Structure formats: C-alpha cells, structure tokens
C-alpha cells in the first residue's frame, strides 16, 4: 500500500506558507495566535 505522506517542500509552502496564511481572514487569525503564543516559527 502506498504511504499517504509524500513530502514536498513546494506543496508544503503553498498550502501552509506565510502568503497562503495572509490570504484569508482566518489565516491571519492563525498567525496572530501563533505570535501571541510566542512561536519561533510562524509558518511552514
């Protein structure tokens, strides 16, 4: 059986990257929460 996780840095960035987060209101909420929590890395 094929494994479900086939890593790709390009797909990772396009789906979970900074610009993708900034493109929606909820994505900006995600970034705000992660900043408030003090995360070292905000996005993938």
UniProtKB/Swiss-Prot annotation:
Keyword Magnesium tagged: no
Organism domain of life: Bacteria
Region of interest (Disordered), residue spans: 1-44
Keyword terms, alphabetized: Ribonucleoprotein, Ribosomal protein
InterPro entries xref list: Ribosomal_bL34 (IPR000271), Ribosomal_bL34_CS (IPR020939)
Ranges of compositional bias, category Basic residues: 26-44
Pfam families in alphabetical order: Ribosomal_L34
GO biological process, one term: translation
PROSITE patterns found in the cross-reference section: RIBOSOMAL_L34
Keyword Protein biosynthesis found: no
GO molecular function: structural constituent of ribosome
UniProt GO cellular component terms: ribonucleoprotein complex; ribosome
PANTHER family referenced in this protein's UniProt entry, alphabetically: LARGE RIBOSOMAL SUBUNIT PROTEIN BL34M (PTHR14503:SF4), MITOCHONDRIAL RIBOSOMAL PROTEIN 34 FAMILY MEMBER (PTHR14503)
Similarity field: Belongs to the bacterial ribosomal protein bL34 family.
Name by which UniProt lists this protein: Large ribosomal subunit protein bL34
Organism of derivation: Hyphomonas neptunium (strain ATCC 15444)
């Amino acid at each position: 059986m094929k494994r479900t996780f086939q890593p790709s840095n390009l797909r990772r960035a396009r789906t979970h990257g900074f610009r993708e987060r900034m493109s929606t209101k909820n994505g900006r909420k995600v970034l705000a929460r992660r900043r408030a929590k003090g995360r070292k890395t905000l996005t993938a």
